[in-house]
Amino acid sequence: MLNPIILFLAIIFDRIIGELPESIHPTVWIGKLIAFLENIFKSTNCKNKYRDFLFGSLTTFITLLVVGVIAFFVDKCIMLLPFPLNYIIYGFLLSTTIGYKSLFEFCKKPIEYIKNGDLEGARKAVQHIVSRDASKLDKEHVLSAAVESLSENITDSIIGALFYAIFFGLPGAFVYRAINTLDAMIGYKNEKYLWYGKLAARLDDIANFIPSRIAGILLIITAPFYKGDVKKAIYGFLKEANKVPSPNSGYTMATLANALNITLEKIGYYKLGSGKIDVEKSLNAFKAVDYTVVVFLIIYTLIWWIT
C-alpha cells in the first residue's frame, strides 16, 4: 500500500497549486485522447447499437490501456529516484488526479454571490457546475445545486483517486481519473452516446461503488465536527441514497443533506433531506468535506502503520 506521506503531499500540492494549465494537465491529455478515438470510432446515433457499443468499448479500452501503461512506467521510474525526491514528484503527479481546490472554487462561487445578494450572478456561476437550466432558479435552489455538486464530487474529485492510489499507486489513480473522464465525455444516456458510452458509464459506476460509500460513512463519522446531526446523517445514508438516479452519488448527497438538516432538490428528479438551506449551512458543507478528507487520511495512516 502507498505510503500515507505521499497522500498528504498530494493533498497539499493540490490545495496550494490547484489545477495545472490545460497544456500540461494529464486529465486534459486524457480528454484529447478520448476525443481523438471518438473521431475514429464515430457513433451512429443508435442506428446500429451493436457497432456503437463495440466501438465505444474500444475507445474505453484503448484509453484505459494507454493511461495505465504510461502511469505504470512513470510510477516505476519515480521510485528509482532517491528519497525524498521520489515522494515529492510522486505526490505532485498524484495531485493532478485530484480536484480538491477547483471543486471548492467552483462550488463556492454561487454561494458567495447569494451571500452578496446577487441572485443573477449566482445563477450564472452555478450553471458552470450543473447541467440543469439555472436561469430561473430561486435562491434556495441555487444553493442546493452548489451543495449537490460539492457533495456528489467528494468521491469523484478527492476520495476516489486517493482510494485507488492506496492500492494501485499512480496507475490506479490515473486509470480512475480516465474512467471519470470517459464517463464525463461519452457516458450520456442520449441518442449519440446511449450505446457508445455504455461501457464507460458502467465502469464509472463500478469504480465509484466503494469510494462513494466510504465517503458517505466518513460524513457520518465527522458530522459532530461540522455541526451535523449523526442520526439524521445515518438516516440519509440508509434511507435516501437511492432517491438519486446514480447508484453512487446519493450516498454522499443524502448523507450530507440530512446531516446539515437542509433540503437538496433537483426539481422533477429528487428531493433529499429536510429543513431550509441557507448560506451558513451551505458553507458548512465545505467544512464537512475538509473533515472527511482529514479523517480519511488519518484512518489510512493508522491502518498503514499497524500493518
UniProtKB/Swiss-Prot annotation:
Primary localisation category: membrane
UniProt record similarity statement: Belongs to the CobD/CbiB family.
Any one GO BP annotation for this protein: cobalamin biosynthetic process
Coiled-coil blocks: none
Natural source organism: Methanocaldococcus jannaschii (strain ATCC 43067 / DSM 2661 / JAL-1 / JCM 10045 / NBRC 100440) (Methanococcus jannaschii)
Membrane-topology descriptor: Multi-pass membrane protein
Transmembrane helix is among the record's keywords: yes
Protein name as catalogued: Probable cobalamin biosynthesis protein CobD
Function summary: Converts cobyric acid to cobinamide by the addition of aminopropanol on the F carboxylic group.
Subcellular location: Cell membrane
GO cellular component: a single term: plasma membrane
Membrane-spanning parts: 53-73, 78-98, 156-176, 206-226, 286-306
Gene: cobD
Keyword Transmembrane: yes
A Pfam family this chain is assigned to: CobD_Cbib
Pathway membership, UniProt: Cofactor biosynthesis; adenosylcobalamin biosynthesis
Sorted UniProt keywords: Cell membrane, Cobalamin biosynthesis, Membrane, Transmembrane, Transmembrane helix
Molecular function in Gene Ontology: ABC-type vitamin B12 transporter activity; threonine-phosphate decarboxylase activity
